[in-house]
Curated annotation (Swiss-Prot):
Belongs to the WD repeat ARPC1 family. GO terms for biological process: Arp2/3 complex-mediated actin nucleation. It is found in: Cytoplasm, Cytoskeleton; Nucleus. One of its GO terms (molecular function) is actin filament binding. This is Actin-related protein 2/3 complex subunit 1A. Keywords: Actin-binding, Cytoplasm, Cytoskeleton, Nucleus, Repeat, WD repeat.
Length: 370
């Protein structure tokens, strides 16, 4: 595991370039900082300044090398690099509330933006007018959209929102998409078609994170009621929900067809397994706690504790986990969702950690990624 402390401020969101030599992140303000890897060090290479509200989402297209950002200023920008300088292009989102999340489609010919306007803007490039335009998916979303993920077929889009529901929509745009083949989620896919809807009916919580599996037939999501759920379209959209004993999870990703990694307010990533019978189980926390060392306190430390914490005891305030505050995002670092070798987490502590499954399997007894 390698931990790098980028900032004292929280890292709101991050995105990697194709070969993982650069990371774009937002230091909880209106800027995007791009860091470049030099040996074992990370040095700041660029600052992207165009938004005038907090950045809420970043995604980096691996093939076309374009960055898309969205923010609380209700805008999104597509950034392209020319002669070593990143230039922004404004996207016409047509929303009257903050944008909350952005994600490139697998073919990188469109992207989706969630927002507080209770809608999803699906954006594509209109070459005759030379600008990015959007189409809206509105019904039946009844609250802020918090998370999005694309199906591998470049058409279906999963969305988690504050109305306690996770939905799968068709984001088919005839101007840029070929007619999609039938999927286990359905065969008719006009734009905005609701393919599936999960959750709600008085239970659940805000849906913080969603993730399709590599095959696209499974969908995982995490909610504010500390549940993890998986829906399997190949099993007539059977849903398996696991209520955990942990604090709410904020981000989720498939790391193989049967394994899911999620992380959130407990400050450490967790592994869940979804077997072929449709049973979802908790496997393990993926953080090996550091051993705390008992030692005697000096008089100086005793008085300092009395002054700062109103106690004479030596209470170590550092957490045993690598991250010292909530993890806000999980992303694939090496290979892909089919066979992930390493994944990355960033959090409110301003740190970024890269987790290696091979190292984790050797340090956690009985751990196997299936």
């Amino acid at each position: 595991m390698s931990l790098h402390q980028f900032l004292l401020e929280p890292i709101t969101c991050h995105a990697w370039n194709r070969d993982r030599t650069q990371i774009a992140l937002s230091p909880n303000n209106h800027e995007v900082h791009i860091y470049k890897k030099n040996g074992s060090q990370w040095t700041k290479a660029h600052e992207l300044k165009e938004h005038n509200g907090h950045i809420t989402g970043i995604d980096w297209a691996p093939k076309s090398d374009r960055i898309v950002t969205c923010g609380a200023d209700r805008n999104a920008y597509v950034w392209s690099q020319k002669d070593g300088i990143w230039k922004p292009t404004l996207v016409i989102l047509r929303i009257n509330r903050a944008a909350t999340f952005v994600k490139w489609s697998p073919l990188e010919n469109k992207f989706a933006v969630g927002s507080g306007a209770r809608l999803i803007s699906v954006c594509y490039f209109e070459s005759e007018n030379d600008w990015w335009v959007s189409k809206h998916i509105k019904k039946p979303i009844r609250s802020t959209v918090l998370s999005l993920d694309w199906h591998p077929n470049n058409v279906l889009l999963a969305a988690g929102s504050c109305d306690f529901k996770c939905r799968v929509f068709s984001a088919y745009i005839k101007e840029v998409d070929e007619k999609p083949a039938s999927t286990p989620w359905g065969s008719k896919m006009p734009f905005g078609q609701l393919m599936s809807e999960f959750g709600g009916s008085g239970t659940g919580g805000w849906v913080h994170g969603v993730s399709f599996s590599a095959s696209g037939s499974r969908l995982a999501w995490v909610s504010h009621d500390s549940t993890v759920s998986v829906a399997d379209a190949s099993k007539s959209v059977q849903v398996s929900t696991l209520r955990t004993e942990f604090l709410p999870l904020l981000s989720v990703s498939f790391v193989s067809e049967n394994s899911v990694v999620a992380a959130g307010h407990d400050c450490c990533p967790m592994l869940f397994n979804y077997d072929d019978r449709g049973c979802l189980t908790f496997v393990s926390k993926l953080d090996v706690p550091k051993q705390s060392i008992q030692r005697n306190m000096s008089a100086m430390e005793r008085f300092r504790n009395m002054d700062k914490r109103a106690t004479t005891e030596d209470r170590n305030t550092a957490l045993e986990t690598l991250h010292q505050n909530s993890i806000t995002q999980v992303s694939i670092y090496e290979v892909d969702k089919q066979d992930c070798r390493k994944f990355c987490t960033t959090g409110i502590d301003g740190a970024m950690t890269i987790w290696d499954f091979k190292t984790l399997e050797s340090s956690i007894q009985g751990l196997r990624i299936m």
